[in-house]
Amino acid sequence: DGEQQSMLFSNEGKAIRCSETDARVMGRTAKGVRGMRVTLAAAQVEDDVETDTDSEDEESSDLNVASRIVSLVVVPETGEVLCASANGYGKRTPVDDFPTKKRGGKGVIAIKTSERNGELVGAVAIDVTKEVMLISDGGTLVRTRASEVARTGRNAQGVRLIRLGNEEILVGVVAVEAVEVEDDILDASIETTEETVVDE
């Protein structure tokens, strides 16, 4: 509607928040404009000839990697953003902690991409009524309440969201509506389980 803001997140833990009006309307075949300046691999540097201005609030991450955009989030009027890293750590941060900037900058730190955390896998807009689903490359799936994830500032490393096995990494995160299970349905489920155990 021309009045919303969006946030781009890179795998090196950076985020940039800007107005949708910063990206002009273009046709389907157009290349588009730079939303966020990412760290390029050595082979790509010579091809990067654009001259967009970097963000004044640019900060460095701990991991020295070629980066890519991993998430685009429409900024809610109120609420938070949950970031999840490859090694199963994450946190939720108020959207107000992210300053609005012009597009094309390097962004600010959204989560520390330390050796412990690994790269940023994804970010989602949440509030305390939502739940979060996390999945690993080994098929491990965890669903948890967003309110149970620690709420911290941008520069924090976060807490463990999912316990992973050796060489297993987190590959996806998504916010879902909370599902309330009525007590009578839960009791019936427990009774059925107990009967099954007795029969065995």
Set out the residue ranges of the language-model regions:
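Short, structured "edge-of-domain" segments at secondary-structure transitions
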Residues: 1-200
